[in-house]
Amino acid sequence: MEIIFGQNKIEQLEPVQAKVTGSIPAWLQGTLLRNGPGMHTVGESKYNHWFDGLALLHSFSIRDGEVFYRSKYLQSDTYIANIEANRIVVSEFGTMAYPDPCKNIFSKAFSYLSHTIPDFTDNCLINIMKCGEDFYATTETNYIRKIDPQTLETLEKVDYRKYVAVNLATSHPHYDEAGNVLNMGTSVVDKGRTKYVIFKIPATVPDSKKKGKSPVKHAEVFCSISSRSLLSPSYYHSFGVTENYVVFLEQPFKLDILKMATAYMRGVSWASCMSFNREDKTYIHIIDQRTRKPVPTKFYTDPMVVFHHVNAYEEDGCVLFDVIAYEDSSLYQLFYLANLNKDFEEKSRLTSVPTLRRFAVPLHVDKDAEVGSNLVKVSSTTATALKEKDGHVYCQPEVLYEGLELPRINYAYNGKPYRYIFAAEVQWSPVPTKILKYDILTKSSLKWSEESCWPAEPLFVPTPGAKDEDDVPCRPSRDCGVQGPHRKSHCQLSIACVPEISAFGRQTEDNQGSTVILRYTENLNY
């Protein structure tokens, strides 16, 4: 296997036109923005973890059947400081940066003191968030960076803490039909409380307040939930929403705040301060968006680690929600760069395969129901919710599928009953090998794969005016040419006709230029 992990990627600052063989649907117009780690070595210093790398923004502009690609490193304060010093000087979650050994004792002492209550990185490498007409690169700290979606220039630095009291925030917000943003963050020991904060960013700013103001600066707290532990809040990567409720999992994968505060002095990374407790429970919080208060019943399930919520909706008095769950936290450990060697695909094995699980949570619990009775009356799932003697409810999921990650849906169905999931297939190795379309109703799937291809998170773009959830108009063509990828390519764009998963366009970029290939095939790899 060609070693690509840990190599610094070269920017493509000016748009380069891709060669298209075949045709792109005429209605597909716009710009796809991607974000992720691109630089893992600065001078002689190296990051420890794949998800520590400096953010590289990617842009695929599709206009009238043509594709243009460009990429640019996010000009964060972190990036600039590291490049100017020619070494890593800003700590990331898996890599602790230390002062220059040439500094005097007073400078070193100040560095140790400042890291006790750290100012986190603005290396926003996880996702892109849209707020009104603005676009932001995001990570899981309190910082986001505004970017120009056309040029990929880095603009304003925004600190969530100026508007809502959060030290950490997710990179997977939700959007309502009006374009308002709903997100979650953790507030650590604020006024004696550690809490999970749900906050809302309006899509537009009132006319009287528009001057010089962006929607983010009008963020407001929607609801807060007290952490079960003051100094060990739960880690979470995403959450779920229905039309009337928010779904939050307080899982036993936790941050130890005291250990984080002393990590710098102890010579360890912040990531080492996370731990999974197999003896603890996963608590399910259901928040009513109308009252802005949690449903009072205590719901819980077995210990698990969830990074991605898929979707949630209401049916017959229950909230049904789907997540990708693990039995432990081994996934994060596998992406330390020391483990990403040439034998990574063959030797790296998860101790828990990611499973698609459906939970059903009853919104109204009958006080007269017998202890041990199943409170779920929904016929579409085998998930159960068992009443216990103390009034708590133990939820057991229905396992829908084993071996998928990076789930996406037709977002028009977010918070509503839905049928299809588009994801990357992941078995015991953390490397995705196939793109998968899963049908929840029939429990069947369609798959696509190609040799030496690692598919990333898919994105569903519905047909304009589509009536069906998976409606895309393009159909296979027998006359389209095929050109293989360059051996050293590291960036690809695939365009698929989803009902059949039969048409793929791939854009590759390397030092020899960029190519887009549209491949139309008659058969699938099952």
How would you describe each model-predicted region?
Residues 1-526:
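Beta-propeller domains
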